[in-house]
Amino acid sequence: MTEKLGILAIGHGSKLPYNKEVVTQIADYIARKHSDVVVRAGFMENSEPTLGEAIEGFSGTGVTKIAAVPVFLASGVHITKDIPRILSLDENGCGTLEIDGKTVPLCYANPLGADELIADLVFKRVQEAL
């Protein structure tokens, strides 16, 4: 059986539209660069789709495994407690989802963290501001 990866890009959500726009755009960039991957964005609170609705969005896509990636810079309570609880992950960041009557493995990625690519982006934003 051919593996088909799904990516769940997780945003915090906000009453304002900006967080949703950014997370959705990042998910769209990933989907365009990796056309063989199914990408969905979901939000913890104050934005739609919710995480549950985003997971439902994998129905009919044929995904055989899903990576959930928090689009957050650093770990905090949402990353270490809330999202793992919502996704029913074990202590190793693993779990399963039922999609189209099949059990699909789910793994939890780290937040973005400190990375040279982010440092380059910060410097780019500084240059744009000057």
UniProtKB/Swiss-Prot annotation:
GO molecular function: cobalt ion binding; nickel cation binding; sirohydrochlorin cobaltochelatase activity
Catalytic residues of the enzyme: 12 (proton acceptor)
Residues bound to substrate: 48, 73-78
Record keywords: Cobalamin biosynthesis, Cobalt, Lyase, Metal-binding, Methanogenesis, Nickel
Residues engaged in binding Co(2+): 12, 78
GO BP terms in the entry: anaerobic cobalamin biosynthetic process; methanogenesis
Enzyme nomenclature, EC number: 4.99.1.3, 4.99.1.11
Pfam family, one: CbiX
Superkingdom: Archaea
Catalytic activity: Co-sirohydrochlorin + 2 H(+) = sirohydrochlorin + Co(2+); Ni-sirohydrochlorin + 2 H(+) = sirohydrochlorin + Ni(2+)
Pathway: Cofactor biosynthesis; adenosylcobalamin biosynthesis; cob(II)yrinate a,c-diamide from sirohydrochlorin (anaerobic route): step 1/10
Binding site for Ni(2+): 12, 78
HAMAP family: CbiX (MF_00785)
Family: Belongs to the CbiX family. CbiXS subfamily.
Function: Catalyzes the insertion of Co(2+) into sirohydrochlorin as part of the anaerobic pathway to cobalamin biosynthesis. Involved in the biosynthesis of the unique nickel-containing tetrapyrrole coenzyme F430, the prosthetic group of methyl-coenzyme M reductase (MCR), which plays a key role in methanogenesis and anaerobic methane oxidation. Catalyzes the insertion of Ni(2+) into sirohydrochlorin to yield Ni-sirohydrochlorin.
Complexes and interactors: Homotetramer; dimer of dimers.
Protein name stated in the entry: Sirohydrochlorin cobaltochelatase
Organism expressing this protein natively: Methanosarcina barkeri (strain Fusaro / DSM 804)
